[in-house]
């Protein structure tokens, strides 16, 4: 009987130990072989919906991946929205430069031009070195 509960992933067993005996009831419910009394309610709910409503611990156990996906889905959505806004403002690479200028016009214009020149020269040297290295290799 214990081996069945141990066969579950460790991540699931940890919240159970925190939640207490209620989680054991759901463990028995999810494992119909172990619990005969709860098997009827499990057959009706198929996913311990009754035990879910009675205790919150099974929700953390059974729908852990569901909760994670739900919690992750709203958080990246505002990020995607922000990225979408930037992409609309700056659809191309030169557009991103104009965006940076619009945010910090005075400071970025002079510095950016110098940096651009340095970056371009560095990139050229790097590409030449890489290409020559590849040829020799």
UniProtKB/Swiss-Prot annotation:
Q: Where is the composition biased (Basic residues)?
A: 78-91, 126-137
Question: From which organism does this entry originate?
Answer: Sus scrofa
Provide the GO MF annotations for this entry.
DNA binding; zinc ion binding
Positions carrying Phosphoserine: 132
Q: Where in the cell is the protein located?
A: Nucleus; Nucleus, Nucleolus; Chromosome
UniProtKB keywords? Chromosome, Developmental protein, Differentiation, DNA-binding, Metal-binding, Nucleosome core, Nucleus, Phosphoprotein, Spermatogenesis, Zinc
For this record, an example GO cellular component is:
nucleosome
Find motif (Nuclear localization signal) and give its ranges: 110-118
What this protein is called in its record is Nuclear transition protein 2
InterPro entries (alphabetical): TP2
Which PROSITE patterns does this UniProt record tie to the protein?
TP2_1, TP2_2
- The segments labelled Disordered in the record are 1-137
Cite a single GO BP annotation: sperm DNA condensation
The entry sums up its family as follows: Belongs to the nuclear transition protein 2 family.
UniProt function note? Plays a key role in the replacement of histones to protamine in the elongating spermatids of mammals. In condensing spermatids, loaded onto the nucleosomes, where it promotes the recruitment and processing of protamines, which are responsible for histone eviction.
Bias kind Polar residues: ranges: 1-21
Q: Where is the composition biased (Low complexity)?
A: 22-74
Q: Which residues of the sequence carry a binding annotation for Zn(2+)?
A: 12, 16, 24, 29, 31, 35, 38
